C-alpha cells in the first residue's frame, strides 16, 4: 500500500483555478491604467532631470534655464580664417656653416674620444659617428678642403716619387 505516492501526485499536479470574468476585467483595467502612465513625468524637463551628474560639489541644484555666460556677438562680423603655416623645414645651411656645426658637435667629440681611448661603441652610436664623419668628408670635398694629415701624406708621397725617379736615372 502506497498512500504517500498517491498524495504526492495529487499535490504536484493541482489544477490552476480559473479566474472569474470580474477578476479578468479588473486586471484588464489595471493594465490599461499602467499603460496610460508610461512616459516621462510631467514637468521633468524643468524640474532638474539629471541630479547625479552635475551636483557632486554643489548643494543647490543648477537651474537648467541658465545657459552659457560667454558673450555672443549680435552683429555680422567677418569670419577670420586662419592660414595654416606649412611646417618649416630645417633651413639649408651653407656647407661652411654646416661643417662648422659638425666640427663643434660635443656628442661627436665625446664619442671620438671614447674611440681613441679604445672603448667600443654600441652599434647605434657607431653608425651615428660614421654618418657624421661621412657628412664631414662630403662637405670638405664640396669646399675643396682636405685634412692636414692628408696633405702631409701627399707631400711625403711626392717626395718619395721624386727620389725614386732620381735614383732610377
From Swiss-Prot:
Record field: compositional bias (Basic and acidic residues): 20-30, 160-169
Keywords noted in UniProt: GTPase activation, Ribosome biogenesis
Listed GO MF terms: GTPase activator activity
Disulfide bonds: none
Listed GO biological process terms: ribosome biogenesis
The keyword S-adenosyl-L-methionine is annotated on this UniProt entry: no
Chain intervals with Polar residues compositional bias: 49-58
Family in the record: Belongs to the YihI family.
Purpose: A GTPase-activating protein (GAP) that modifies Der/EngA GTPase function. May play a role in ribosome biogenesis.
The protein, known as: Der GTPase-activating protein YihI
Organism: Escherichia coli (strain SMS-3-5 / SECEC)
Amino acid at each position: 500500500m502506497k498512500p504517500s505516492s498517491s498524495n504526492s501526485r495529487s499535490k504536484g499536479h493541482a489544477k490552476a483555478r480559473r479566474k472569474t470574468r470580474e477578476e479578468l476585467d479588473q486586471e484588464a483595467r489595471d493594465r490599461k491604467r499602467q499603460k496610460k502612465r508610461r512616459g516621462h513625468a510631467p514637468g521633468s524637463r524643468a524640474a532638474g532631470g539629471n541630479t547625479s551628474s552635475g551636483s557632486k560639489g554643489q548643494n543647490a541644484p543648477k537651474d537648467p534655464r541658465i545657459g552659457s555666460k560667454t558673450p555672443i556677438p549680435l552683429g555680422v562680423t567677418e569670419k577670420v580664417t586662419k592660414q595654416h603655416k606649412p611646417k618649416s623645414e630645417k633651413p639649408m645651411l651653407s656647407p661652411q656653416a654646416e661643417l662648422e656645426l659638425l666640427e663643434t658637435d660635443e656628442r661627436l667629440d665625446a664619442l671620438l674620444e671614447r674611440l681613441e681611448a679604445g672603448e667600443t661603441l654600441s652599434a647605434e652610436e657607431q653608425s651615428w659617428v660614421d654618418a657624421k664623419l661621412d657628412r664631414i668628408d662630403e662637405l670638405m670635398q664640396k669646399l675643396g678642403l682636405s685634412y692636414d694629415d692628408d696633405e702631409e701624406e701627399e707631400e711625403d708621397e711626392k717626395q718619395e716619387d721624386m727620389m725614386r725617379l732620381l735614383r732610377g736615372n
